[in-house]
Amino acid sequence: MKEESTAAIEEYERQIFDLRQLLEISKSLNSTLDYTILIDSILFTILGQMKVLKAGLFAKKNLDSPSFSLHRNHQGFDLRRDVEYSIPEEHPLVAYFTRAYGCLTLDEIRRSLGSLAGLEGLAALEPSLVIPLKAKGVINGILVIGERIEGDEFSATEREYVINIANLAAIAISNAFLFEMTTTDMMTKLKMKHYFYTVLLERMDRARTDRRPLSVLMLDIDHFKRFNDTYGHSCGDLVLKQTAVVLQESVRPGDLAARYGGEEFCLLLPDTDGPHAVGIAERIRKGVEANRIAYEGKTLGVTVSIGAAGYDPTRDVSAKTLLDRADKALYLSKQEGRNRTTLSP
């Protein structure tokens, strides 16, 4: 009887400890809406809590993605170049997880679906457990973890625990996607002006405190009205989208590109002084110029004019002051013939 009581007390203590851990995990995961930081937080939480050497997350790259792709911040897995690590949203596994929520091994998935066809990327990882992330009845990610450090199998209690972590992760990802929707321009997939301003203010404060450089670019599509007037607004929309793609491909991790309004864009370049900002601007300008846009049998060329400004704490008392300097430099680029970059003095 005494042994049973002791065992019961130990079990309750374990449950209380797990609940406290889950509370701390929930606080941690919901402390950020930055998608990349959130993914890192989820994976490191799994590594530590489950005592595993490998962890990865299949997630959507953006709101319109038709598949879940293995996020680049995976931990411990050795990837092969000849394998596409993705799971189509329409794959039966996603539907299965929607109606039968729980973590499974690869063998359990094979038995449940009949085969692993279409899951070659998942199978190549050889995960010990596959765990769906489900929020509001929708699968928004698939977590994979490798073998335990001790080498033994996961117990039923551990499976339940990792599902609880997955539930918290799913809610955090759902919140991050909602934030993404409210801060992203749906046409260009770039950030909106109001979000750009918010981040710029934070970066300016950090640059002033840490005495680090910071620059902004203002960019405008040359003769944009001609595309609308000559070919119609659908052509103008395509030009905006294609220009945005070049911007996204040209910026570095940590940079921020946004649609400022109409055919005008802005970029935030942390740890970058004015001359280096001009180099980045020129890379963007040349990239846009080299990009040929096909529209209804025609090949269209696009150019942009750019204004750059390096942050000066003695002059730039507000975000508007800094952006106004970049905007004036943009105006000079247009005055001097367009398709060029001008640095604000």
List the model feature ranges, each with a label.
Residues 1-31, 36-37, 188:
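Signal-transmission linkers at sensory-effector interfaces
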Residues 44, 56-89:
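GAF sensory/regulatory domain recognition
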Residues 78-104, 109-110:
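Acidic/proline- and glycine-rich, intrinsically disordered low-complexity segments
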Residues 103-127:
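Signal-transducing coupling segments at domain and membrane junctions
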Residues 126-134:
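A short, aliphatic-rich beta-strand micro-motif
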Residues 194-204, 208-215, 225-252, 258-262, ...:
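Conserved long alpha-helical elements within nucleotide-processing catalytic cores of c-di-GMP signaling
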Residues 278, 311-344:
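Catalytic-core segments of nucleotide cyclases and related cyclic-nucleotide turnover enzymes
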Residues 286-304, 334:
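Catalytic core regions of nucleotide second-messenger enzymes
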